[in-house]
């Protein structure tokens, strides 16, 4: 799910300079529309084709959320007057241009999420759940401080799942990691921390996620996602998968919501960064992550990636080998395997020469995090993802299909830095093959982790906030445009029709005020190609 963006910088790139700025941007539940809040109103855009379908002048808007493509919109202001207070939520009918209801809360509203059955309003320390058909309040949940406004609601009413951060807790407490329960007011989980323990202690786990059934209004489980504090969470549209990232920004994990089992783990990069947004494709074949590096990474949820993540039992000899190897890493400073010092987060050369003294501690924390959850995962029957003929290569090994399919490389992104990283990853794979039999499988996966299937570079300033979504297949008209920007492999006999079926929209909205539309090759992966871009900073009163 996407997150609200802060006020944009005054720099607008190639766009026409205006006095307008963006307070908020998000995709709707099926990624067919974008809602944008400005200093003087809000707009709603259709993404395919990209057109403005609604523009309303108003006060400064901090949140504008859609209910799919219906006329119902939830609006929260950013003004100082009572009518535009950030504590007031207005549910608006855009077709009738009328307010359905107004709700006032004790503190500022940080997020609003909706599906066809529920509306969820998040304050810093409270969650309110409403029946969206009657706007009657059904339930309240008291939570620990959540200033980042992290919350996710599935768009499906079949699996009406709500996810939000759990309070910190001691990692050595003997609790079932995915069977946490709470009482009606959901306060019992706040007792995880003894009174004499400082909540800011480095010994506490801050990255757990509570799974809540919004239909039955009952908590389901607590998923131990990360040791560090959460930075982003997202639920798949059908409510079956949960994606998480911590404030380190190096690891993205995907869990089965029903069982709490970790299905996938991906390494975004080695250097810490801020992950702004996680988002699943509608068919759960991909999950994408946008970050402060201006790079969006797309990870494939296939069988090969699952096999490289699944826990397995290991012998005492492997345990001892792991301990010896960890000790040798502490003693030999600066002698890390090549694959542990590369970074896929940004193709810029300066990232390769950045100080990386913190890598050892982060790697050790990743290992400890993996070993801590082994006690639970090894006792579960892990569900296997079933191969699908509609996956276009997502499930199963590429080599098993025939010759290995090389990823698409954008000539505009070729650089010495990227060549060094590719060489480093190749050396890492060879090291993993030789050392794998002697290491715990979790540590072996750190030597040769799942990495991104595809990526794209957003033409934006560093630390520009972005939200991202994966849409439908690219149309034939856009393929003609795509052909103007890239050279098609002469050895490929793929027809335009087949090529069309292989490409998906990857859409990015930046806080600088741009909408970017990229093409993702679902079979080859690699670099996504920029198809089009549009400015969102035209006069908000022009519609």
Swiss-Prot record:
Which GO terms of the cellular component aspect does the record hold?
Answer: endosome membrane; phagophore assembly site membrane; vacuolar membrane
Question: What is the annotated localization of this protein?
Answer: Preautophagosomal structure membrane; Vacuole membrane; Endosome membrane
Q: Which UniProt keywords apply?
A: Autophagy, Endosome, Membrane, Protein transport, Repeat, Transport, Vacuole, WD repeat
Q: List the disulfide bonds.
A: none
> What topology in the membrane does the UniProt record assign?
Peripheral membrane protein
Q: Where is the composition biased (Acidic residues)?
A: 343-372
Its primary localisation, in coarse terms, equals: membrane
UniProt GO BP: autophagy; protein transport
| Sequence motif: L/FRRG motif, positions | 266-270
Q: In residue terms, where are the WD repeats?
A: 225-265, 270-309
Query: Biased composition, Polar residues: where in the chain?
Result: 173-183, 326-336, 377-400
Where do the coiled-coil regions begin and end? Answer: none
Renumbered to this chain, region (Disordered) spans 163-200, 326-408
Q: What the protein does?
A: The PI(3,5)P2 regulatory complex regulates both the synthesis and turnover of phosphatidylinositol 3,5-bisphosphate (PtdIns(3,5)P2). Necessary for proper vacuole morphology. Plays an important role in osmotically-induced vacuole fragmentation. Involved in correct ATG9 trafficking to the pre-autophagosomal structure. Might also be involved in premeiotic DNA replication. Required for cytoplasm to vacuole transport (Cvt) vesicle formation, autophagy, glucose-induced micropexophagy and ethanol-induced macropexophagy. Required for the involution of the vacuole that occurs during micropexophagy.
What is recorded about the domains? The N-terminus might form a beta-propeller domain involved in specific binding to phosphatidylinositol 3,5-bisphosphate (PIP2), leading to the association of the protein to the membrane.
Per the record, the similarity remark reads: Belongs to the WD repeat PROPPIN family.
Assembly description:
Component of the PI(3,5)P2 regulatory complex.
Name of the protein in question: Autophagy-related protein 18
Q: Write down the species.
A: Komagataella pastoris
Its organism's taxonomic lineage begins at:
Eukaryota, Fungi, Dikarya, Ascomycota, Saccharomycotina
Gene from which this protein is expressed:
ATG18
